[in-house]
Amino acid sequence: MEGVTTDAWTQAQVELHGRLTLSELADLFETSAPKIDAIIHNFPQPIISQFVMDAVTHEQDMRSALGVPGGRDSKAVEVGVGFFLNLIEVSDPPLFNELTSTSVSQWDILRSLTGRRTVKQMNALGLDGEAIALHFPGSPFSLPKEAVE
């Protein structure tokens, strides 16, 4: 999966699957699931947590696009935030302390850490948007220029 998360990789996926109907996409996912199921129990930490973070992030993207909220207090959201906290604890202890002591919901923290909140939105939540923004360069995430949700 060379180039995964790059714009070129994303565009290649759109070109490959963009003409499929929702039913055809569901069938494709259905045939792929057993392959993942057969190996997922062997995924080590932190890869498995990253896998969960990615899945729940895209689930929430779809929910937002469809206007169907839900799953905001799920174990998957907790695991996704935990994935980031493990990284931030080492790289930025003050931000780690802020994120683990705030009253901001885990869902809003996840959406902030995955590029679904502007700095202004993060600040309005009571988070240090500028400090969070410093973690985006070199990651697969980028800050939106305009409010996403």
Regions found by a protein language model. Give the residues of each.
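Hydrophobic/aromatic-rich structural module bridging two neighboring secondary-structure elements via a short loop
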Residues: 1-39
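Structured surface interface patches that mediate subunit assembly and partner/cofactor docking
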Residues: 2-6, 31, 38-149
